[in-house]
Amino acid sequence: MSTTTEILAHHWAFGLFLIIAVGLCVFMLTGGFLLGGRAKGRAKNVPYESGIDSVGSARLRLSAKFYLVAMFFVIFDVEALYLYAWAVSIKESGWIGFIEATIFILVLLAGLIYLVRVGALDWTPVRSKRQVVKSDIINTTNNHPQ
């Protein structure tokens, strides 16, 4: 038997699964396109407000910093899930598991320190931070004659 025939003999079920999955996706997308209604009015892209006329724009612009902090949160949150799984199995893992978790926490801490040092968690860019000069400091001593 040739190599190609052996590969097909071992993986025919996976190939059939891929063909059926792609065919089902194409069928559903084509069916939705052919059977779906077409809205041709001006109000097609206006959000539904329960019969009340819309006021203003429905779009909310968020700073790119929000998405950056959200990504950092997701990354560190997933790593916290790994620590939770370690905490559940702490009796089985013993001292070796404790040392591995300590190294993992130190790597997380190094990543957090790096993010702080780079300024990735600062909300305002450096150019917009106001520099404190001597004239901005309020004089707390009373120089008025009494």
Swiss-Prot record:
One Gene Ontology term of the molecular function aspect: NADH:ubiquinone reductase (non-electrogenic) activity
Ranges annotated as spanning the membrane: 14-34, 68-88, 96-116
Enzyme Commission code(s) on record: 7.1.1.-
Matching InterPro entries: NAD(P)H_OxRDtase_bac/plastid, NADH_UbQ/plastoQ_OxRdtase_su3, NDAH_ubi_oxred_su3_sf
Record's keyword terms, sorted: Cell inner membrane, Cell membrane, Membrane, NAD, Quinone, Translocase, Transmembrane, Transmembrane helix, Transport, Ubiquinone
GO CC, alphabetical: NADH dehydrogenase complex; plasma membrane
Cellular localisation: Cell inner membrane
Principal localisation: membrane
Catalytic activity: a quinone + NADH + 5 H(+)(in) = a quinol + NAD(+) + 4 H(+)(out)
Membrane topology: Multi-pass membrane protein
Function of the protein: NDH-1 shuttles electrons from NADH, via FMN and iron-sulfur (Fe-S) centers, to quinones in the respiratory chain. The immediate electron acceptor for the enzyme in this species is believed to be ubiquinone. Couples the redox reaction to proton translocation (for every two electrons transferred, four hydrogen ions are translocated across the cytoplasmic membrane), and thus conserves the redox energy in a proton gradient.
PANTHER family named in the record: NADH-QUINONE OXIDOREDUCTASE SUBUNIT A, NADH-UBIQUINONE OXIDOREDUCTASE CHAIN 3
Self-association and partners: NDH-1 is composed of 13 different subunits. Subunits NuoA, H, J, K, L, M, N constitute the membrane sector of the complex.
Family assignment from sequence similarity: Belongs to the complex I subunit 3 family.
Name of the protein described by the UniProt record: NADH-quinone oxidoreductase subunit A
Upper lineage: Bacteria, Pseudomonadati, Pseudomonadota, Gammaproteobacteria, Enterobacterales
